């Protein structure tokens, strides 16, 4: 295993943050905690329901961690949408993270997908059954064009996760494969379209801006995620199918060359994002900028990405990139480092346990009632 290229990672991260003029001022601390708890509380009650518990079959600790991660992502990044929209998106994207972490083969459950869809029957695949049930709660916030993007991108994401089950990095020489898979499982169009709720944006009058934002966001958000998650995935056996490592296989290049390819694409996309929308509708630009800054804050502060380890490792170094990275990290931590104990309560497992007891109590109360009716008959 190669050593992690710390200096290169620092330089790339610093350039990214400078290109987007990183300065997250999306919330006061009180507003951030309020929105985090609101979105978490609604989502936690959703996943504590008996049907969700029965069909998902996810380890409680993993579900809790997934929910906390996604609530953070949505609240930090979708800073301009309503709290209700944040909560509904948090539920939707938690479902996607649960699927992404799953290792179940979907083949058998997808045999009759289209026939069931056409006939209006519940999907055989439990994930689709639950996602479809929740989808109306998400789509009610958006116009028809954005809604279509959310539906289509979610379908693509499912297919991308299916492909990833095979741990296939592409055949050597198949240069289109890495980006094909990354676009499919990146949820870029879903994310890009979900920034524009109909109560704030008229998708007809802003159709060109919204379409362009979806196109730009598709690559920007997945490439930034790939870059910021490179450290956590570097030596994790479960994360060996990544864009960078697929470049190594398909393009037959070194890890350093693959990382450089991702770096140049990410920086170019960041420049485009700022340049394209700087003279467009001000509300559109503010929304995009808030998303970009919040999305970076989330990556820097969420423990899933372990970037605090990088900061600790280089904080005594005197190089310009190390000092700049630590300054950016401190800047992000000052606004985004909020302990889950301040907002992620009560735990989903506790809520599920209460619901389970309530169901049992109802059944116990109902049983003698039925017996009495039978006796009368």
Curated annotation (Swiss-Prot):
One MF annotation (Gene Ontology) recorded for this entry: trichodiene synthase activity
The encoding gene: TRI5
Signal peptide: none
Annotated organism of origin: Fusarium poae
EC class of the enzyme, as a word: lyase
Protein name stated in the entry: Trichodiene synthase
Role noted for this protein: TS is a member of the terpene cyclase group of enzymes. It catalyzes the isomerization and cyclization of farnesyl pyro-phosphate to form trichodiene, the first cyclic intermediate in the biosynthetic pathway for trichothecenes. It serves to branch trichothecene biosynthesis from the isoprenoid pathway.
EC numbers for this chain: 4.2.3.6
Pathway this chain belongs to: Sesquiterpene biosynthesis; trichothecene biosynthesis
Note: Trichothecenes are sesquiterpenoid toxins that act by inhibiting protein biosynthesis.
Domain of life of the organism encoding this protein: Eukaryota
């Amino acid at each position: 295993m190669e050593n992690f290229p710390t200096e290169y990672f620092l330089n790339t991260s610093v350039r990214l943050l400078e290109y987007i003029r990183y300065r997250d001022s999306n919330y006061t601390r009180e507003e951030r905690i309020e929105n985090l708890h609101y979105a978490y509380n609604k989502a936690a009650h959703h996943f504590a329901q008996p049907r969700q518990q029965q069909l998902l079959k996810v380890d409680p600790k993993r579900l809790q961690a997934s929910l906390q991660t996604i609530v953070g992502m949505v609240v930090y990044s979708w800073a301009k949408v309503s709290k209700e929209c944040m909560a509904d998106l948090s539920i939707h994207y938690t479902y996607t993270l649960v699927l992404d972490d799953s290792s179940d083969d979907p083949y058998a459950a997808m045999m009759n997908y289209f026939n069931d869809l056409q006939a209006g029957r519940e999907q055989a695949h439990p994930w689709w059954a639950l996602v479809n049930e929740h989808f109306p709660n998400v789509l009610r916030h958006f116009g028809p064009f954005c809604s279509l993007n959310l539906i289509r991108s979610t379908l693509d994401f499912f297919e991308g996760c299916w492909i990833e089950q095979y741990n296939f990095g592409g055949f050597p020489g198949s240069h289109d494969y890495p980006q094909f898979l990354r676009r499919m499982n990146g949820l870029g169009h879903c994310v890009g379209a979900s920034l524009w709720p109909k109560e704030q944006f008229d998708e007809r009058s802003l159709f060109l801006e919204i379409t362009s934002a979806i196109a730009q966001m598709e690559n920007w958000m997945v490439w930034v995620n790939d870059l910021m998650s490179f450290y956590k995935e570097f030596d994790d056996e479960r994360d060996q199918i990544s864009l960078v490592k697929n470049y190594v296989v398909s393009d037959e290049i070194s890890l350093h060359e693959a990382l450089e390819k991702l770096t140049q694409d990410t920086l170019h996309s960041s420049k485009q994002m700022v340049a394209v929308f700087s003279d467009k509708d001000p509300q559109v630009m503010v929304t995009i900028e808030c998303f970009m800054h919040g999305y970076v804050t989330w990556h820097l502060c969420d423990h899933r990405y372990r970037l605090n380890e990088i900061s600790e490792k280089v904080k005594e170094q005197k190089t310009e990139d190390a000092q700049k990275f630590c300054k950016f990290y401190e800047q992000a931590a000052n606004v985004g480092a909020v302990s889950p104990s301040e907002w992620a309560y009560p735990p989903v497992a506790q809520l599920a346990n209460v619901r389970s007891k309530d169901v049992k109590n109802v059944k116990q109360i109902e049983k003698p009632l039925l017996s009495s009716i039978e006796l009368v008959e």
